Design a protein with these regions (language model features):
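Extended, low-complexity, turn-rich repeat/linker tracts enriched in Gly/Pro/Ser/Thr and Asp/Glu
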Residues: 348-359, 453-455
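C-terminal segment of classical bacterial N-terminal signal peptides
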Residues: 14-22
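Bacterial N-terminal signal peptides that target proteins for export
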Residues: 1-8
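Proprotein-processing/basic-patch segments
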Residues: 291, 429-512
Length: 538
């Protein structure tokens, strides 16, 4: 055993896998751990019908982790670098999705679940790479900070972080999610996806790439085992922050994975999952979906705007403290007059402030009846909620947008002892259907307490579409990104319904509290990653 470990490390650190080599793939073990944490800590399966059933299948889960490795396959195979690069981006992913939809209609059997899970892992890998490799507006990439603080280049960072991942997460017996990776890839489907644009890709080349990734995965584990005491001391920034750096760390990658897996799974079922992305690199590597606007207003500061605050407040703190929220999703991608099975708005309840909650809070959802502008009001990118005087037409209480237009489409009661740190949802199907029939009359959703509820104390705070950092220093983790407001629209019929009579419980998924049934229409996806301009991967 010792001899085998030494041989693996010799291969890992020899010329074939030197830091400058394309075979020093983008942190394969790190990618897998991001996918593990997405399933166990970030993904909210109650939001997407059918997704819990998919990942309750252990073989599908293993296929998902293998898919998280897949896109880097060609960096270790001569002449396959372009094919590997393309596997990271939307053109490849969209063709892949269409082939899966054609080959595997519902209901999905075991083979279909494994193929779909593998695909979702591949999508996750590409998303994880963006903040790892590339700076965003005011967001330094993970690789940039690794170079700054630990003096490690691209390839060195990825090998050593993989070894640190092994030390922290995979060293204990039974904790490695893959153990020994295999090459049971869906080669036939992959060849069909590659066929039109990459005829040079063969099953033999894919197998060669798979074997190289498996060797790298095992090799970084061996490196971590042999140097488990020295590596954390030698690379202190990476050892301290590989998980909690908000832009590119493991938690951030898991959060991004949960968003993309939800988005593409909804597309596979003929629906749409809308959630605001970070404006990563734009234009170029990534065209983010930014079509979500939200703000809350309150009577105590009737000219204030909160459009860029990370916290979204929907209830007052007792008599006279009137406040309400508005939210709008860009539904322009929805085909005209498409049948809608269900549509649900999901908000993440982050906390309470002010006086103790003295009675149940009832928050109702209504269609908005007039136009409004999100605005740029911001006081604190971590804990802000107060806003600043409105400029440039940003919505404020004085605008009077919150007039109640009749009966609500849905209302949610939040009890005194209801826990925070969970998703809350409203059935907004009538509002989405109205938008499809009369888009010129669609202005979004109004969320406010009912008159009977408004007298009680306690302000309920949800995460807004601007929520990102949990600490000012950037080391509070990246979970907030995947907990921004979401609209899930699913079609009628089997695609938009749950498997069987009830959604199965997945014991190792963080399914959270049970949600009321819901979903909504089939729709074109939001703008996605396109092209590969300026790519520097591998």
């Amino acid at each position: 055993m010792r001899r085998n470990v030494i041989l693996i490390v010799a291969v890992l650190t020899g010329p074939a896998l030197s830091p400058a080599s394309p075979a020093a793939a983008a942190g394969i073990r790190t990618h897998v751990q991001m996918c593990v944490e997405a399933l166990t800590q970030q993904l909210a399966p109650e939001k997407i019908p059918g997704i819990s059933d998919l990942f309750a299948d252990q073989e599908a889960r293993r296929a998902f982790y293998h898919g998280c490795m897949f896109p880097d396959w060609g960096f270790a195979v001569q002449g396959m670098k372009d094919a590997a690069e393309d596997a990271h981006w939307d053109k490849f992913q969209t063709r892949y999705l269409e082939i899966l939809k054609d080959r595997f209609p519902l209901p999905w059997n075991g083979e279909a679940k494994r193929e779909i899970a593998f695909y979702l892992g591949a999508v996750a890998h590409g998303a994880q790479d963006i903040p790892w490799h590339f700076d965003g507006p005011s967001h330094p990439s993970y690789l940039r900070l690794s170079e700054k603080y630990d003096k490690l280049n691209h390839g060195e960072t990825e090998k050593r972080v993989d070894a640190l991942v092994y030390i922290r997460y995979h060293r204990e017996p039974g904790s490695d999610p893959l153990g020994k990776p295999d090459c049971a890839w869906p080669f036939g489907t992959l060849l069909a996806v590659y066929g039109p644009s990459h005829p040079e890709v063969t099953k033999e080349k894919l197998q060669q790439g798979c074997q190289a990734l498996a060797a790298g995965y095992l090799g970084t584990g061996a490196l971590g085992e042999l140097h488990r005491k020295e590596l954390p001391k030698k690379h202190p920034w990476n050892a301290a922050h590989l998980a909690d750096y908000y832009y590119g760390g493991i938690e951030a990658g898991a959060s991004m994975t949960s968003m993309l897996v939800s988005r593409y799974f909804a597309r596979l079922r003929g629906g749409v999952h809308l959630q605001r992305d970070i404006a990563y690199q734009k234009p170029g590597e990534f065209i983010p979906f930014e079509g979500v606007a939200d703000a809350h207003v309150y009577a105590a500061q009737e000219t204030y705007n909160t459009g860029l605050e990370p916290l979204f407040e929907l209830t007052g703190d007792g008599p006279g403290d009137e406040r309400y929220g508005v939210i709008r999703f860009d539904l322009s991608a929805l085909p005209a007059r498409i049948p809608v099975g269900s549509a649900r708005l999901w908000l993440y309840l982050a906390g309470r402030r002010g006086n103790p909650q003295t009675a149940p809070k009832v928050i109702a959802a209504y269609p908005l009846t007039q136009a409004w502008k999100e605005g740029t009001g911001e006081t604190d990118g971590v804990a802000g909620f107060r806003g600043v005087p409105s400029t440039g037409g940003g919505i404020s209480y004085k605008d009077g947008v919150g007039s109640i237009p009749g009966d609500p489409v849905d209302a949610v009661t939040i009890e005194l002892d209801a826990p925070v740190g969970r998703w809350i949802s409203w059935d907004v199907t009538p509002i989405v259907r109205r938008h499809i029939a009369h888009p010129e009359e669609s202005f979004g959703i109004l969320l406010r307490e009912t008159r009977e509820s408004a007298g009680g104390g306690g302000v309920l705070q949800f995460l807004s579409s601007q929520a990102l950092k949990a600490q000012t220093d950037g080391y509070g983790g990246g979970a907030r990104l995947g907990r921004r407001p979401a609209l899930v629209v699913m079609p009628p019929g089997p695609q938009g319904s749950r498997y069987g009579a009830a959604e199965p419980t997945c014991p190792t998924l963080s399914c959270g509290p049970p949600a009321r049934p819901g979903s909504a229409p089939p729709a074109a996806p939001p703008p996605a990653r396109t092209g590969r301009a300026g790519s520097s991967r591998g």
